[in-house]
UniProtKB/Swiss-Prot annotation:
This is Golgi SNAP receptor complex member 1-1. It is found in: Golgi apparatus membrane. Component of several multiprotein Golgi SNARE complexes. Disulfide bonds: none annotated. It comes from the Eukaryota. Residues 1-201 are cytoplasmic. It comes from Arabidopsis thaliana (Mouse-ear cress). Pfam families: V-SNARE_C (PF12352). Belongs to the GOSR1 family. Residues 223 are vesicular. Keywords: Coiled coil, ER-Golgi transport, Golgi apparatus, Membrane, Protein transport, Transmembrane, Transmembrane helix, Transport. Involved in transport from the ER to the Golgi apparatus as well as in intra-Golgi transport. It belongs to a super-family of proteins called t-SNAREs or soluble NSF (N-ethylmaleimide-sensitive factor) attachment protein receptor.
Amino acid sequence: MDVPSSWDALRKQARKIEAQLDEQMHSYRRLVSTKALSKSDGNESDLEAGIDLLLRQLQQVNAQMQAWVSSGGSEMVSHTLTRHQEILQDLTQEFYRHRSSLRAKQEHASLLEDFREFDRTRLDLEDGYGSEQALIKEHMGINRNTAQMDGVISQAQATLGTLVFQRSTFGGINSKLSNVASRLPTVNTILAAIKRKKSMDTIILSLVAAVCTFLIFIYWITK
């Protein structure tokens, strides 16, 4: 920035910077008032840097005006300097106030975003835990079904073994029955012969008894 050589040039320079500051402060006020709760971006940073630069330039011009007044300026010049100094002070205070408000909003937004991120992480962990629990339950269900299937297979194998044993037992019985059946004709023949022999013995005994009785009767009559 060129250094003005006269009071009028300093005043013009001060008013020019003040006008630029008014314009940028208007934009900054609107930004702060309408800024949604979000983290910092490049818009306010660029605007703040421009305002801060203009404030430093206005401060330098005021310092030059102060040096001019100190070198023997009139009371009117001193009053003009005071007015420019008040404008600089008001703009500086307003800028710092709005910037503090914006920083508070940004910090609040950052905290909210951190909490949201924490909630998302927690939900992701809970979802992961829920999925893990579901897999564990599914695995346990498969194990239970496998155990039940093993039990059914064991029972089936035991039943099959019993049936095989019974089949072999019945096979032995059938074999014995077949043996007996094959020998029955011989047994029947023997039994029939025994019965016939008993019948003959009975007949003979009966005849002997009858003869003896007849002889005794004859003997008794002739006596």
